[in-house]
Amino acid sequence: MKTHYFKKIFNLKFLVIFFSILFCILLILDLTFERRIKGIKKRTDEIIKKIKDDNHLVEEIVFYETNSTIFEKSFYRVEILVKNKNNLTTKEKWYAVVDSIFFHEIHSLIKGRENIQIKDPKTDFHLSELILSLVPIVSSTIFMFYIISNIKKSSGKLNSNAKVSAKQKSLFTFKDVAGNTEEKEEMTELIDFLKQPQKYETIGAAIPKGVLLEGPPGTGKTLLAKALAGEASVPFYAVSGSEFVEMYVGVGASRVRTLFKEAKLNAPCVLFIDEIDVLGGKRGGNSSGGNQEKDQTLNQLLTEMDGFTQAKGIIVIGATNRADMLDAALLRPGRFDRKILVNLPDIKSRAEILKLHAQNKKLSSDIDFHQLAQQTPGMSGAQLAAVLNEASILTVRNHKDFITMTELSEALDRVLMGPAKKSIKYDPEERRMVAYHEAGHAVIGIKLKHAQKVQKITIIPRGNAGGYNLMMPEKETFFSSRKRMLAQIQSFLGGRVAEELVFDDISSGAFDDFRQATKIARLMVTKYGMSDLGVSQDSEFSDKKLIDTAIKKIIDNCYARTKHLMLENKTLLDQIAHLLLEQETITQAEIEQLVVNTKK
């Protein structure tokens, strides 16, 4: 109780107030003393003058010795009692703080004058002097106590800064994880390891010590780890790799030890390390201080997972989107025994994710999650959740009671391209050029066999784009072919070709299209072996000129084929552009109707 009260007194707020008051007292006393010192010469001259003056009778002079802690010098406070010759009943008392020179001067001045009584110097006790002498001692003591206590606290925080929640259980289960069917099957087996470890130990089976979840951001790696802990009803520890990185040497390794020590006390448990590539990156030959600290932290993690002191009953789950950056010692069996690739969701999983995130939302009866899933290939679970959240916000903004496909479509555009910039007003000729540019992309998507198909076209500016085509593949594939990649290049070039054919001019709006087309062509040449250079991959010794020539050849051939296809479908190009100028946005159904009308 006393210790707690003592700590409560010496908190930061109290110390600030205490030192502020102490400083004010010290300042007042110091100023008072200085004011008295500044008046010494004036008062000394005045006193000497009045002692010499015949109009005054000096009766008594008393000296008090004062040892100043400020000036480290002896002073005297002199008190003089005098009478006025003209009025003997009137007495005056003068005083001053003087130095030893004045003390001797007074003695020589009044020497032999019997009517003046001089008393020997007395010690002058002043409370202010006592306070002034005690202030440095008391202040230093309190300050040192505060510094030491803070160092202890800081040391504790540095050693264990991880977000530990050992006393809490994860509230998530695999029911809260939509999609990721194969990943959940792999994780389900770990539940039995955590619940009944002795069943495996009796037959000599080693329980997996670590599971590495690798995949793009937003695919649900953290959620899978939480669901595992929730299903097994065991404590869940969650830390980030960056929490082990500090400027102080040895702190990272100390935090790893502290974390595993805490986890061992609550085993069986799940220890989740997000962005483990920060902590477990490859060790190099650089011996700088930062790398040494990083290597020490990694070495401690390796030791804790499978070293002299093995962590029993603890399943370590690491999550990263850069598994290629991890150290080989961390990936070997005995540490991360299992590696699970968490891919972006397919169309079925996307529909399930959308339904899961829509459970607490008011939806219109016309919502088609399968159609929405078709329009979102390549999107992660986090992005799909963002689409539904944006749709909810738009519904409130539009003063509606239910989320409709209109809000969902707009929310999808906002997540992919950003909010619409309807305040931007195009010049009529610019607007017409944008319409034909987007129509050019659409024509290639409609008429080219292996190209992605158009879902929606708009000339409403979003982000840095003057307009855009929402184009999706007819079916999802796990790899790309040469024909698909060439068709994709032609789709990017369609806008530029349309501008050239209609206006005999080109705009800077195709800048990003060229960048994307060139990127695909470069991959075909340098990585996939889909050019005349053969199947060899690019290296530092490759002839850059030959590579650039091969890339240019692919782009030129695609441009020529795109131009030929655009000339064959000039009527469809005009109809799409005119409808865009009228409506600004065209849906997939309207595009299909235009194609049917053009064929008649």
From Swiss-Prot:
CDD domains: RecA-like_FtsH. Residues 1-8, 152-600 are cytoplasmic. ATP binds at G215, P216, P217, G218, T219, G220, K221, T222. Binds 1 zinc ion per subunit. Pfam families: AAA, AAA_lid_3, Peptidase_M41. The chain crosses the membrane at residues 9-29, 131-151. One of its GO terms (cellular component) is plasma membrane. One of its GO terms (molecular function) is ATP binding. Keywords: ATP-binding, Cell membrane, Hydrolase, Membrane, Metal-binding, Metalloprotease, Nucleotide-binding, Protease, Transmembrane, Transmembrane helix, Zinc. Its EC number is 3.4.24.-. InterPro entries: AAA+_ATPase, AAA_lid_3, ATPase_AAA_core, ATPase_AAA_CS, FtsH, P-loop_NTPase, Peptidase_M41, Peptidase_M41-like. It is a multi-pass membrane protein. SUPFAM superfamilies: FtsH protease domain-like, P-loop containing nucleoside triphosphate hydrolases. GO terms for biological process: protein catabolic process; proteolysis. PANTHER family: ATP-DEPENDENT ZINC METALLOPROTEASE FTSH 1, CHLOROPLASTIC-RELATED, METALLOPROTEASE M41 FTSH. Homohexamer. Acts as a processive, ATP-dependent zinc metallopeptidase for both cytoplasmic and membrane proteins. Plays a role in the quality control of integral membrane proteins. In the central section; belongs to the AAA ATPase family. NCBIfam families: FtsH_fam (TIGR01241). This is ATP-dependent zinc metalloprotease FtsH 1. It comes from Phytoplasma mali (strain AT). The gene is ftsH1.
